[in-house]
Design a protein with these regions (language model features):
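C-terminal end segment of the histidine kinase catalytic
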Residues: 157-199
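Short conserved segment of the HATPase_c
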Residues: 119-132
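Helix-loop junction within the histidine kinase core
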Residues: 21-32
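Short alpha-helical segment of the dimerization/phosphotransfer core of two-component systems
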Residues: 3-13
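Glycine-rich ATP-lid/hinge loop adjacent to the conserved G-boxes
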Residues: 132-143
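Conserved catalytic submotifs in the C-terminal HATPase_c
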Residues: 31-36, 53, 58-68
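Short helix-loop "hinge" at the ATP-lid/N-box region of the Bergerat-fold HATPase_c
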Residues: 87-88
Length: 199
């Protein structure tokens, strides 16, 4: 329902703001543990089922089986929740989203693909630049501030990865990140904002 949609959007915005504030003030700790990334990805994605149903969007999973990785589970859930929200926001009613997980010798590669409005190539860097307040609107005029993707970029880096975006205007977008099977062993993990995050 519309009420559920608004509640979910409000919760995610507040959660994103809290995590972004912690990240920028050096108060976000990374807690790595060994998990099946396929299970985490499916669980986190299904949290967006109600929102997808409002726009009659079909969510498909292309996941071959369990893949063991070392990651911060809460961060990965936040990454997936934001990527799913983004894919739903810019998908047309009755569209579809494909979530895929692939295994490499050292990593798991996770992708969220939509077939929605897409992004102009020159606009992609603006989405990930915290210095630019880049406003966008979804297919039902859902507002997008860019904070979600900036947080996703930050959290992927904290898990030893980078967010990559492939998009074509009018054809849709694919957001991909990787998670290492083994994280580097150290007493402390350097916080990119200047603090020290302890594992």
């Amino acid at each position: 329902t519309m009420g559920n949609n608004i509640t979910e959007s409000t919760f995610m915005l507040l959660d994103n703001l809290l995590k972004w504030t912690k990240s920028q003030t050096g108060r976000m700790n990374s807690v790595f543990q060994e998990v099946d990334i396929s299970e985490v990805v499916v669980f986190a994605s299904k949290m967006s089922d109600l929102v997808a149903q409002v726009k009659s969007i079909a969510v498909e999973y292309d996941i071959p089986g369990p893949i063991s990785v070392n990651c911060d589970v809460d961060m990965v859930k936040t990454i997936m929740r934001n990527l799913m929200s983004n894919a739903i926001k810019y998908s047309n009613e009755g569209g579809r989203i494909i979530i895929s997980v692939r295994e490499t010798p050292t990593h798991a590669r996770i992708s969220v693909r939509d077939f929605g409005t897409g992004i102009r190539e020159e606009d992609i860097p603006k989405l990930l630049n915290p210095e630019i307040h880049y406003m966008t609107y979804g297919t039902k005029n859902e507002e997008g501030s860019g904070l979600g993707l900036q947080l996703v970029q930050d959290l992927t880096r904290r898990n030893g990865s980078e967010l990559t975006i492939e998009s074509a205007e009018g054809e849709g977008s694919t957001f991909t990140f990787t998670i290492a099977k083994e994280q580097p062993r150290s007493e402390t993990v350097e916080d990119t904002s200047g603090g020290i995050a302890r594992p």
